[in-house]
Amino acid sequence: MKIKVLLLAFGCSMMSFGAYAQKGVDTGTPFGSGEDSVRCITNISLFVPYAKAGNFKDAYEFWYQAYTECPGAHKDIYLYGVRIMDWKINTEKDPAKKAALIDDLMKVYDTRVKYFGNDRKYGKDWIIARKAADYIRLKGDNADPKVYYAWLGEVINEFGENSEAMGVSCLLYTSPSPRDVEESR
């Protein structure tokens, strides 16, 4: 009788662990909890070597799982995520899908700001400067100056003279010269 009670108690406790296994994005923890934390660490461990080797095709699925389930777990999700998304954008032939992938890349930058924007060396200003540079590079003539001016202007207003040089450079490089403004009148 005692064995049946113990087995029943053990079975009930094992089933309840599934209820506690939540994704990091849901719980606000870096790795989640329970089985999800193991899956998160596994996905990070699997995509990083592929990405380091430049094998972005094999890295993508593992990276995407880590990015969506435990976005605050590790900076590598964003360091390699930008490269993986850039690869996907450059290999995509359909213009509509390419535009959607560019939007997804911009979201990767936004998510990095959310989780790692307070990094001392590579903080919000550094991240937004790279976001704007990639937006301009990938959109080309279709880049909307109002969009990246808003991003860069916010960062420059927030950080002032301590703003990332690349952000200031992007803003100045893409700003119309006084002569261009005069000619457009």
Question: Which residues make up each language-model segment?
Answer:
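Bacterial Sec-dependent N-terminal signal peptides
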Residues: 1-30, 82
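N-terminal leader/linker segments that initiate helical-solenoid repeat arrays
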Residues: 22-80, 84-90, 95, 99, ...
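Flexible helix-coil transition and linker loops at the boundaries of alpha-helical arrays
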Residues: 32, 67-72, 111-123, 157-163
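Generic helix N-cap/helix-start motif at coil->alpha-helix transitions
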Residues: 35-43, 74, 122-130, 160-169, ...
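Short coil/turn linking the two alpha-helices of tandem helical-hairpin repeats
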Residues: 87-93, 132-142
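Conserved small/polar residues in nucleotide/adenosyl-binding loops
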Residues: 173-180
